[in-house]
């Protein structure tokens, strides 16, 4: 278990840690798309990917909650890729090295990817939870927010 996975809420930090291990630079989101679709498949959740690369994962309502309005959670997959000049790091292949320093989650020598990795982690934690009654859930993960909002502008018809 990584240091950040000991933080609360545990599921959110567990998924954030997993996300930091998946390279996800803008316009190169293939690995995080595979992670998201594997997440959905392993939990028997409905998912769909559009031609732009956006992914939506749906979770049916809890029994008795089917008539509640759907809740949509949205986050983007890509991250700002910046590193310190003295750091040897490849954002297309290397996992982010995280640590806790003075109560803050930080990355070693690179950007952390919390925008919007923590949003993705929160959405995955909600999808993973079975202990909270809920109406229909849809979690939308868009591509290339950091360099052009490509996913938002190219959202496939009928995705939501």
Language-model features: where?
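Active-site metal-coordination/substrate-binding segment of hydrolases
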Residues: 65-142, 146, 153-158
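Acidic/His- and Gly-rich active-site-bordering loop/insert found
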Residues: 3-103
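Short, flexible active-site loop motifs that bind/organize anionic cofactors or intermediates
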Residues: 2, 23, 109, 113
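Conserved strand-to-helix beginnings and helix N-cap segments that scaffold or border functional pockets
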Residues: 30, 152-153
């Amino acid at each position: 278990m990584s240091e950040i996975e000991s933080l609360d809420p545990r599921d959110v930090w567990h998924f954030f840690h997993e996300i930091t291990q998946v390279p996800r630079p803008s316009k190169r989101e293939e690995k995080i798309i595979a992670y998201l679709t594997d997440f959905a498949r392993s939990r028997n959740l409905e998912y769909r990917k559009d031609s732009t690369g956006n992914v939506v994962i749906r979770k049916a309502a809890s029994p008795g909650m089917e008539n509640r309005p759907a809740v949509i959670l949205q986050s983007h997959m890509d991250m700002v890729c910046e590193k310190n000049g003295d750091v040897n790091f490849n954002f297309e292949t290397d996992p982010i090295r995280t640590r806790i320093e003075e109560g803050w989650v930080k990355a070693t020598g690179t950007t952390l990817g919390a925008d919007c990795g923590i949003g993705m982690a929160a959405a995955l934690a909600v999808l993973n939870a079975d202990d909270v009654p809920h109406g229909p859930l849809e979690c939308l993960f868009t591509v290339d927010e950091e360099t052009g909002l490509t996913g938002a502008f190219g959202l496939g018809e009928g995705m939501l």
